[in-house]
């Protein structure tokens, strides 16, 4: 996966496979991370937001968005870091 795959999805809702039903996560940001030349592709970070009533534990989720996916992504909860909207925030770091 690369940053270029996710930039068009910013602002869209992705579905994370959960029980009893998929959780809706909005992709609010996709940004590059400092490239130290240690990986075959530039590192990047994705930030997702869920509704206040949805709280995911850190782990691996199968995610989809329209024609994109399924892809397996590790998510972990993070601080809101200035986001004003209510809800929980999660990050996926690709390095």
State what each model feature region is.
Residues 1-95:
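Surface-exposed, beta-sheet-biased, low-hydrophobicity segments with strongly acidic/polar composition
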């Amino acid at each position: 996966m690369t940053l270029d795959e996710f930039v068009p999805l910013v602002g869209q809702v992705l579905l994370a496979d959960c029980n009893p039903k998929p959780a809706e996560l909005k992709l609010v940001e996709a940004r590059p991370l400092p490239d130290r030349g240690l990986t075959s592709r530039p590192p990047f970070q994705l930030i997702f937001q869920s509704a206040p009533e949805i709280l995911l534990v850190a782990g691996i989720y199968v995610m989809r968005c329209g024609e994109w996916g399924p892809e397996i992504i590790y998510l972990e909860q993070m601080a809101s870091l200035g986001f004003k909207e209510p809800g929980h925030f999660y990050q996926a770091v690709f390095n």
